[in-house]
Amino acid sequence: MPRYLIERSVPGLSPEDLNAAGRRSVAALATMPDVRWIRSYISDAEGKIFCEYDAPSVEAVHEHARRAGLPVDRITEVNLEISPEMFV
């Protein structure tokens, strides 16, 4: 299944907002069994969330965001994961 990185602008995101967004995301995922949220990273300094998802298509990622009421700035499909251990 393709893997995607999603960039979201969320300036001024409070802990309560983050909790609500996470709950909406999980609820949307419950209706979309082919979409899987892997993890997210938050940059308070930039007002961004960077999310990692597995999904059958870019359209499925957009549909999840729509159902969850989440912004999407950019979606990038990634196809190779590397780590420092690979080069030792």
Residue ranges and their predicted role:
Residues 49-52, 73, 84-88:
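Short amphipathic alpha-helical patches
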Residues 34-40, 74:
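A short linear hydrophobic-aromatic micro-motif
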Residues 4-8, 38-64:
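Short, well-ordered beta-strand segments in beta-rich or mixed alpha/beta enzyme
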Residues 55-81:
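An amphipathic, aromatic/His-enriched active-site/gating alpha helix that lines ligand/cofactor pockets
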Residues 1-31, 43, 80-88:
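Short S/T/G/P-rich N-terminal loop/turn motif that feeds into the first structured element of a domain
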